[in-house]
């Protein structure tokens, strides 16, 4: 039997085609795409991608919309942190 690929991993299916830099980018994206993520509802690491932008937890059966390749996008993380910061400022202003 032949040895499995160590360096190329998932992108071994492309062989020598498309160039090494593009295959490295694809490898990074495909690893994120096929990974399991932490469910925000039940706390288990069971959320997987069903199709583009739709993620489903296998434990609690919840469906969540997110990024195309990863559960959260940088823009969504920035927006969420901004909302949390503004809520804290509003609460502090009401207390004073």
Curated annotation (Swiss-Prot):
Keyword Transmembrane: no
GO terms under cellular component: cytosolic ribosome; ribonucleoprotein complex
Primary location recorded for the protein, binned into one broad class: cytoplasm
Any GO MF annotation of the entry: structural constituent of ribosome
Gene Ontology BP annotations: translation
Keyword presence, Zinc: yes
UniProtKB keywords: Cytoplasm, Metal-binding, Ribonucleoprotein, Ribosomal protein, Zinc, Zinc-finger
Compartments, record wording: Cytoplasm
Start and end residues, zinc fingers (C4-type): 39-60
The protein's assembly and partners: Component of the large ribosomal subunit. Mature ribosomes consist of a small (40S) and a large (60S) subunit. The 40S subunit contains about 32 different proteins and 1 molecule of RNA (18S). The 60S subunit contains about 42 different proteins and 3 molecules of RNA (28S, 5.8S and 5S).
Homology family: Belongs to the eukaryotic ribosomal protein eL43 family.
Function: Component of the ribosome, a large ribonucleoprotein complex responsible for the synthesis of proteins in the cell. The small ribosomal subunit (SSU) binds messenger RNAs (mRNAs) and translates the encoded message by selecting cognate aminoacyl-transfer RNA (tRNA) molecules. The large subunit (LSU) contains the ribosomal catalytic site termed the peptidyl transferase center (PTC), which catalyzes the formation of peptide bonds, thereby polymerizing the amino acids delivered by tRNAs into a polypeptide chain.
NCBIfam families xrefs: eL43_euk_arch
Protein name: Large ribosomal subunit protein eL43
């Amino acid at each position: 039997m032949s040895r499995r690929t160590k360096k190329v991993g998932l992108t071994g299916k492309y062989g020598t085609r498309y160039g090494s830099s593009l295959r490295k980018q694809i490898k990074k994206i495909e690893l994120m795409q096929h990974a399991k993520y932490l469910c925000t509802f039940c706390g288990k690491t069971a959320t997987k991608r069903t199709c583009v932008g739709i993620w489903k937890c296998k434990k609690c059966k919840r469906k969540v919309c997110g990024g195309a390749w990863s559960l959260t996008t940088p823009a969504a993380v920035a927006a969420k942190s901004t909302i949390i910061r503004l809520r804290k400022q509003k609460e502090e202003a009401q207390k004073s």
